[in-house]
Structure formats: C-alpha cells, structure tokens
C-alpha cells in the first residue's frame, strides 16, 4: 500500500503560470487581447495569428525606424478585435472543444492563485494515497470560507505526468468526497472546478474500484448538507466529470464542453476511427449554449474576447463573480429546502432534451 501523504500543506505556486500578488483590474472585453504564439494558435485561429504577427512587426519597425505608425497600428488592432469577435461568435462544436483544450487555458491551480485567498491544500483519501489529478483545500472567496475541489491536468511535462493529465484514479474521487464531508461537518460551501478528459481507465484504477468511487460520490453529493457549486472550466468528459459534478448549481465557462463521451471516443464507436470527431462533437450537443438550452446546466459564464487563454485574469474575475453571487443565493436557503431543490434538479435531467425542438 502506498504511503499516505500528510493531510495539510500550504499551497505554493509551483507549476502554474505565476500570478501577480497584487490584484489587477481585468482588461475590458473591447481591449486588444494578448497575442497568442503561432505555435499555440489553433487551426481556426491562423488568420488571427497572422494579423497579430503583422501588428508586432509594425511595432518593431516603428521603434527601429523612428517612423510614426500609430494610426496604422490602431486601425489594425481594431480589425483584430473584429476578427476575433467574428471568429469566436461562430465557433463550431469541434472548434469549441479545441479552445477548451488550449495549452494556455487557465486550470484549477491558476484560478486558485488568482481568486482564492488563504488557500490551505488538503491531501490524501486516508485509504490509499494522494491523487494529484484532484486538488482539494480550504480558502476564501471574498469573505466566504469554502472548500475547493478541482481537477488539474498539469502544465509542464513533469506536472502532467504527476497529475496523470487530469485523469483521476479512485483515490482522487475518495479524497474529494472526504473533503466534501469535512466541509459539510463545518458548514463550508463546496466549489468544484471540473476539467478532465475522463477518469483513468487503467488496470490499477479498475482494481481499486474507480466506478464504485464515482458512484458513491454521486450518491453522497446528492444529499450532502451544504451548498455545492459545480463549474466546468475546460473539459467535462463522462463519469470523470460527474464524480465531482453533482450540486445545487451547475455552470460552464463559455468555451468549455461537457458530455458523456469525448468526440474522439464517440467517433471511434460510431465510425470506427477518430476522423469523424467534428461530426461527433456536433451530434453530442456538448457546448455550453446547447446544454443550457437542454436544461442540463444552469448558467454560462462569459469568457473574455478570444477565450480564457487570451486573458486569464478577466476569466478569473468572471468566475469569481459567479461563485460569489451563487454563494449568496444558496446560503440564504435552509438546508432541508436546499436538498429538496437539489433532488428535484437531478430528477429533471434529460427533460429538456425530450421537450426540445
């Protein structure tokens, strides 16, 4: 049996991109988004990347030659904002999946650094080990103390391997449940950040009961006597997402996706290969707008122009505002009434799909 890690450890900004210790005001949506490296640009973003490169070249030329190109640069930036808006207003389901997987997209630890104060990380499930794919701990959003549960994919190669690319083992889900029960005991609301390609289906994971661990979480979260807010911040795939996805509010970031299976997995089953993943993405109705129309989710959290990967600070501010508002609403509801509402909410899943045109 693996050695159990310590139960409590101070959070440290080790792997995530550093966040400024001074809270910065988010850039307005009409401001020019931060340029994306050509190596990081998504296939459909290439016209945007090309225009960004031209703007940067003109800025360099202006500095080198001492010629005033400010009018031309301003005009190109205006065109850039229009191009980004047009592109992101017309994303296909498959393009949305690509945005959700962008390597620069904020992950759980990034949001912890940006919006959670006094975060104290809690480790281990007291049965097997400490799964790095799920981060748990206490902290504050505004003046409200919370229990944070979040899935972490990792940034660099070392962290990705440690986090198993966001694919949690059963000990990760048991760790999450243990911390949720701790939260309920001490009257702390639970905030779950979902971002996973799925629970890990390996031999060891199956031997240790990953399906049972997820099922127990579904059962226990359904009746946990404390407010629960669940937010899909990136990928929300299958039971791996459901394992921390039952609550009183279920929201999605604008360019996240949430589905019973990944587009590639669906394509492999229906078309015997991954080539039809774009068709599968459309059929799965996995985008935030589709799922809100179907009644699966409650809210969509708007992302900054060009997606969260272009302006993580603005995305974090939008997420923080949503959590604070939801906490105020849920904290005002007596626990027995809250549990009745949660039960009715769960019973309504799928009804929107039956009544949709």
PLM features per residue range, with description:
Residues 2-145, 313-357:
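Intrinsically disordered, low-complexity segments enriched in small/flexible residues
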Residues 26, 194-324, 328, 332:
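Conserved catalytic cores of soluble enzyme domains
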Residues 85, 89, 118, 122, ...:
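Glycine-rich beta-alpha loop segments
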Residues 106-108, 156-158, 200-202:
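Short active-site-adjacent helix-start/loop capping segments
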Residues 98, 138-140, 145-149, 191-193, ...:
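Structured core elements
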Residues 51, 92, 148, 195, ...:
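Terminal peptide-recognition signature
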Residues 69-72, 172-174, 266:
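Short, motif-level signal for alpha-helix interfacial/capping segments enriched in acidic residues
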